Amino acid sequence: MNVINRFTCSHGQLEKSILRLKSRRMSPIIDYIKESYHVNNAMEIKEKMYLYPNNHFALKLSALGIREKEEQCVAQVEKIIECALENECTVLIDAEEHAIQEHIDGITDHMMETYNGMNPCVYKTYQMYKKDAPEKLRYDLFKARNYSLGVKLVRGAYLKKDKSMGVLCTDEEMTHTQYNQAIADFAYQYKKKDKLLCATHNIRSIHVARHYMKLNKLYNVEFAQLMGMSDALSEYLQRSGYKVYKYLPYGSLYESVPYLTRRLYENMYMLKYI
């Protein structure tokens, strides 16, 4: 298996990859790999929701034109979420580089307020390698709201771009600490229908999540790992009775190479502890 087929799949391989995951009793997070804006990107995502209902979908707002046409981006996100609701899908809005993250968070908050109701069909991503991430999560958990919160915890994948902004943790251990504390904060402060997705390959963080799930009798915590990474860990969690997702990036060969290059380059330092 070459590196592209290990970590991504083509349009033609997508259905087979989804079925393969489900045969292993894991679920996909379907992720259209194209990261640059194109007018047809939203249509591509909606088409896949019709083809593969009852699934999770990752959504990168840079691919919908948040840099170029923010108002149009918001309209596209609304249409995608309405399509997701029609097809019983869930939308995980990705975090991206710090320069546009405030806009992404604002749009995500609006979508959760509008569409989540008592069941989160929209998830917000918290990058725990940022110093202010714990405060943002606590604010969202504590604030008065009449909708459920979908929380996706990641460490972060934009190290090169974000490092110069002065927003990152001072060291690796601080990132670990913040991630694990975020799990604890959720365990003690969540509201009834809130859900947590721990997107991590880090064993210690998984132990922390399992500890609080057992201690507080939590049934609203799930796990996710990347396609082609930590497969033994994913299978162990699935066999232990946990809900497990695998990120399933798909696209053309032309689209996959830049994606893989970016993931490798921006995660060289982070990979040892994600």
Which stretches of residues belong to each language-model region?
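Positively charged, amphipathic and often flexible ligand-engagement surfaces
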Residues: M1-I274
